[in-house]
């Protein structure tokens, strides 16, 4: 029997009235059922919830058993990078487009969430990536990503020359527009658009996907998730960047190198009891239906 949730966090950055209305509906419904609810501060201000318990994402991670993220996958990614540092489960209400990470239908959210609160759910642990920008062995900048870490030019598109080492062994060099380093969670995001493979979320694997390589032989490469990926660069005159989930940018300067490896943190993702990963793929990607 799954554990029951005792305290709930409400998270999101609503961009339109419908998403804000979902936050308001969930707040009043959850408090009406007797749950302690901690609301992300900006949402509480937008809804004028003067007497609500409010806090930052870190506060929610420390105090809540379950964080409910209302929005699209972008909202989920932004919240989950922080919430993954804490012992808190996360579930999403889809107010975006595709919604690979946000399972709950906003029109049916109360019924679905009610079943989850009664212990009818499944839990998945999704690993994160950690990226470090280093010089002479010293770490200068770092971040984490749930979907992908992407090497790309800065403001102007141009070819990049770089070498890739895996577990300190030279793997390949490349001239391309960049490189996508994707988790299984991110394999249905940017990586998929670049021709990368879809990795089932239970796989302990990382995909390296070239972006417009200047050779016909370059292909996506799938490696063990415990591998350490080291990117080294020839001299470059234009800016390079590392982006994490298309939300955080780390500049790369001359003489710096990049190390990407599996983070010690996990996103604890909650799904409704009837969730099916392959049904989600089929519906989101428009795959053909069963023939018989």
UniProtKB/Swiss-Prot annotation:
Domain of life: Bacteria
Cofactor(s) this protein requires: a divalent metal cation
Active-site residues, record numbering mapped to chain: 73 (proton acceptor)
UniProt GO MF annotations: ATP binding; metal ion binding; NAD binding; NAD+ kinase activity
Places the protein is found: Cytoplasm
Record-level GO BP terms: NAD metabolic process; NADP biosynthetic process
Pfam families assigned to the protein according to its UniProt record, in alphabetical order: NAD_kinase, NAD_kinase_C
Residues bound to NAD(+): 73-74, 147-148, 158, 175, 177, 188-193, 247
TM spans (from-to): none
Gene3D superfamilies, A to Z: Probable inorganic polyphosphate/atp-NAD kinase, domain 1 (3.40.50.10330), Probable inorganic polyphosphate/atp-NAD kinase, domain 2 (2.60.200.30)
Keywords: ATP-binding, Cytoplasm, Kinase, NAD, NADP, Nucleotide-binding, Transferase
E.C. number: 2.7.1.23
Listed GO CC annotations: cytoplasm
Disulphide connectivity of cysteines: none
Reaction(s) catalysed (UniProt annotation): NAD(+) + ATP = ADP + NADP(+) + H(+)
Signal peptide region: none
NCBIfam families: PRK01231.1, PRK03378.1
HAMAP family for this protein: NAD_kinase (MF_00361)
Summary of the function given for this chain in its UniProt record: Involved in the regulation of the intracellular balance of NAD and NADP, and is a key enzyme in the biosynthesis of NADP. Catalyzes specifically the phosphorylation on 2'-hydroxyl of the adenosine moiety of NAD to yield NADP.
Family indicated by similarity: Belongs to the NAD kinase family.
Name under which the protein is recorded: NAD kinase
Organism taxonomic ancestry: Bacteria, Pseudomonadati, Pseudomonadota, Gammaproteobacteria, Enterobacterales
